[in-house]
């Protein structure tokens, strides 16, 4: 009497691994390939963990039910013996006809019904186990795919030692480095600026990740020349970006590094740090003429209104008149934070954009962009100009500003 229930109990235990399947449903159609995040992997792992817990709980419940049923069958077998001790034929799935003995017919009928129901449930569980197995295999393949994508993206989030290729990544894909790092200490950080990339062998201009000291990583446009690597901090070329922005925008940066943009005062300050730097200014007019200027500079922090520290010859051309221990100082000014040297006016409101205005009349490379030279002089003064080259009222066609540490002269 115990052998048949025990065999069925074994079948149920084998099939019980599919518990809670009815709540799972069919797998969702595979998503289109895309970059993954750790959150997606965590969601899948959490779902599989919950599924495993549910299966275990269902197995325990089914095991208890089978144990109770087995005990009832054993009790029935003892009660159904004839007075001489001969047992009633064993109750099986194929022998469900009630005995003609004195056993209680209601009890036997109830047990027969339960056995039929259990057999039906076992068949359903076998089917669901097979279905869930296919579902779990698909989930496993998806997790492997996501893990592969995460491994591919790891250079964007880990240090230089995990994948040095992250230092040469251009959108949307990193390029491989030209050679090994110079020393082991460089294996754990990104380059400080474009000049460090140049010193390590990079000769192609483009977009790269850098990380100045004390700053999180960010993307910059590097221009590689025979003089070394230059970090582009501003570009004007087609008027696609509005440069009449508030203080916070000029602090953090705006625009597209591949087109018109302003890198951000705080980023420039971090790149320069305490080192000596030089600023290159490239200008172009509407007749195809070009001018290039270079001069030593230092940029203070936000507590100095990101003041440019300039030497006397250059300072006079830009209108700087504030003496500091480091030289003549020219604070940055916007329409919502006025730091210019005109006490009676706000140069950023009178003109346009944010700039180291001085007395409003020397230069403004972040002014309004005109696609042709306006006729009205009052309108022209709001444009992009550099007084000592094409004059106060000539709006320029294109400008680029670049910085490089002065130590690059010795390195190059």
Curated annotation (Swiss-Prot):
Q: Which residues are glycosylated?
A: 183
Species this chain originates from: Sus scrofa (Pig)
What protein name does the entry list? Angiopoietin-related protein 4
Top-level taxon: Eukaryota
Q: Pfam families under this entry?
A: Fibrinogen_C
Q: Which cysteines are joined by disulfide bonds?
A: 194-222, 347-360
Query: What lineage does UniProt assign to this protein's organism?
Result: Eukaryota, Metazoa, Chordata, Craniata, Vertebrata
Q: Which InterPro entries match?
A: FIB_ANG-like, Fibrinogen-like_C, Fibrinogen_a/b/g_C_1, Fibrinogen_a/b/g_C_dom, Fibrinogen_CS
Give start and end of each Fibrinogen C-terminal domain: 185-407
Instruction: Give the SMART domains listed for this entry.
Output: FBG
One Gene Ontology molecular-function label: identical protein binding
